[in-house]
Amino acid sequence: MRVLGIETSCDETGIAVYDEYRGLLVHKVYSQGVLHSRYGGVVPELAARDHIRKVIPLIVGSLKQARLISSDIDAVAYTAGPGLIGALLVGASVACSLAYAWNVPVIGVHHMEAHLLTPMLNKKLIISNSTSFSDFIDVIDFPFIALLVSGGHTQLVMVKNIGEYKILGESVDDAVGEVFDKIAVFLGLGYPGGALLSEMAQVGIKGRYIFPKPMINKPGFNFSFSGLKTAVIRAIMSSSNDQQTRADIACGFERAVVETLSVKCYKALKQMKVKYLVISGGVSANTMLRSKLLKMMYSISGKLLCPELEFCTDNGAMVAYTGLIRLKAGLSNRDLSITVKPRWSLESLPSIF
């Protein structure tokens, strides 16, 4: 089976085709970063309009690159939520229209479940029947803890199986990726600037700026980054504008974030008595975070699974992949009514088993 995946939840238009046996056949991503950079953040109306302009050409180009025609596609998967409602509606409308025209089922995919499963993308999905997903056992054992870190979410999730999720903790205010981008703007790096901030931090002097590590000593697994954001912005506003000082602030900020995330992960792994950790989402590309978590997992004889760097940010490949899993589990839909969920809890998803 082959599934076309369509991702339009925020400011990336992602298209991909995933084959049950051959793996990922093609994937293309168009980022709206330049469009939104002048505003210092995503403008929802502009995002939706740009998806409208880009989604069809990307689909046509992807099918052409993979040497596929419409009859080669067995289902269409799209991001149904969570996300920006206007952006979501673009992908949903196109997906349902194609499913109707091609007479194939449609699958509305949860954006964060797709991120959660992204680290498995570099493996072919070998399915012996609708309830035997042997490849996942080869990659990582259930249960595991997932750290989902992106521009819109910061969550620690207990994963008992695909579709069986328990949110252990999440940010009570700003998502960590959002804070990275906001601090980057104040550092003069523009939007989106999270990756540039990390590059700047590499030449910063460790220890010159020490910022609070929010909620690491509090019970539970929730996060809070608004106080850290305020502390860093104040440091930027009160400091000299030289490049080294900016790099030192970036270094202190990044270290505070990474330490906070790693402490919460460690506590969750210990309390849940789990040895496997998955990280995904845009911030999972952060080199310092990967290194810190890798050392932590080695110290407890655990295993860390990360996405390939090109799949950390939003993309259609993760949507197609997740759609295929749910299609094989019999969870597709012939009802072509256009449905999106700007707010949608992982815990409400049905299990594939």
UniProtKB/Swiss-Prot annotation:
Gene3D superfamilies in the cross-refs: 3.30.420.40
Localization of this protein: Cytoplasm
Residues reported to bind substrate: L148, V149, S150, G151, G152, D181, G194, N286
Superkingdom assignment: Bacteria
MF term (GO), any: iron ion binding
Cofactor note: Binds 1 Fe(2+) ion per subunit.
Enzyme Commission identifier(s): 2.3.1.234
Required cofactor names: Fe(2+)
GO terms under biological process: tRNA threonylcarbamoyladenosine modification
PANTHER family, sorted: TRNA N6-ADENOSINE THREONYLCARBAMOYLTRANSFERASE, TRNA N6-ADENOSINE THREONYLCARBAMOYLTRANSFERASE, MITOCHONDRIAL
Listed NCBIfam families: gcp_kae1 (TIGR00329), T6A_TsaD_YgjD (TIGR03723)
Family affiliation: Belongs to the KAE1 / TsaD family.
Protein name, entry field: tRNA N6-adenosine threonylcarbamoyltransferase
Gene that specifies this protein: tsaD
